[in-house]
Amino acid sequence: MTRFKFMLLSAACLLFAQACTQSTFEKYFEDKSLRIDYMSMGDAQSQTAVVHELREEPVWGGPKKNLIEPFGYGEYLLEVYDHESSELIYSRSFCSLFGEWRTTAEAKTETQAWYNSISIPYPKNTILVDLKSRNKADMQFYSIMQHVIDPSSMFIDKAPLAENKVVAIQDNGDPAEKVDLVFIAEGYTQDELDKFFADAERFTEALFNCPPFDTCRDQWNVWAVGTVSIDSGTSSSGVGIYKNTALKTGYYTFGLDRYLTTKDMKSIKDATWNVPCDAVFLLINAETYGGGGIYNSYACGTADNERTLNVFTHEFGHSFAGLGDEYFESTVAYESYYNLEKELWEPNITTLVDFDSKWKDLLPEGTPIPTPLNDETKDGIGVFEGGGYLSEGIYRPMDHCMMRDYAPFCPACSRAILKMVDFLSDKQ
């Protein structure tokens, strides 16, 4: 009887905690979105940001219980405070292409301003938005923009935007309790939209045939947004090809031919204004190898290269779960991307400064740290030198992984992915 009473008490406490968490959303937010468009400005040494535009949008697809992010990932952190009580009521971390640009040689001599956008649940009362940037010297976040927002302001745009054709490839239920993945068409003309929707279905099946995504398919919704481009394909400025496309993607980001991205965050957000959205993949109607993935921003890749599906999964690992690159043999545009004196925020690479916070608990007993790469260790989990674009000073969990060379995700990456799935589907 005592055990039965304890079980009842535990269940009651759990239900009470869930009710309190749910009421936090109901207390502070409405079931729609506030989109905050802002300009990031700066160079390699410093940066700031200013709000450009605010929009009310009809759908909030994110979790309603998990409002405060626990991961500590990313180069930026958005914190939302109730203005009256100063209580932290929402937070999300992310990265941006502007943040990457700041690590290039160009940023040492130029100052630029880039457009960016992030959405939060729509507040019921006045809020303070605090945008912070990570300082690589100490890996802490420092404020670069604070802005007070009155949700009743007449200056918040409420106009509907263009409605594209949206197909539910997989609808498993309430967006607040599912991860909502959105494929957006890029470089598909009106006559090519049928191909886009077929491509999106093909990519969906590829994702859920890949461990660990194959174990959690029921926690996902998948949507395809048929944005129409005037031109077919994508730009490739390095060889003189320029296309008029919906999202303005192109190869040669930072001068690197395979790095395929876009600066046009406004068009991405415009395309998803009426669709629940936790993760975005820009599906580009092209054959040439290329892609990119930016944590909690977007990933993109081409539809028809022979390595397309592997590129998709790799880049999605970046954008969805904050996974770092584990390769160290290829050319990149970044300079001094990581501070080797501090621990890295990505869950699958380490400097060993704070390895206890990484995948140490996944290692078999007696595994040497670092782990020598030999015939006995090459197929198992360990701490192998080389990763994060450097052959020395950064370590990866396995010799081969999706984040290095398109092998299956290693245990450290898989755990990080599943934690993010549970967080975004309100299961944590």
Give the predicted meaning of each segment.
Residues 187-190, 228-231, 286-290, 306-308, ...:
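Solvent-exposed loop/turn segments at secondary-structure junctions
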Residues 1-24:
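Bacterial Sec-dependent N-terminal signal peptides
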Residues 193-196, 291-315:
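Short pre-active-site segment immediately N-terminal to the catalytic Zn-binding motif
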Residues 316-332:
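Catalytic Zn2+-binding segment of zinc metalloproteases
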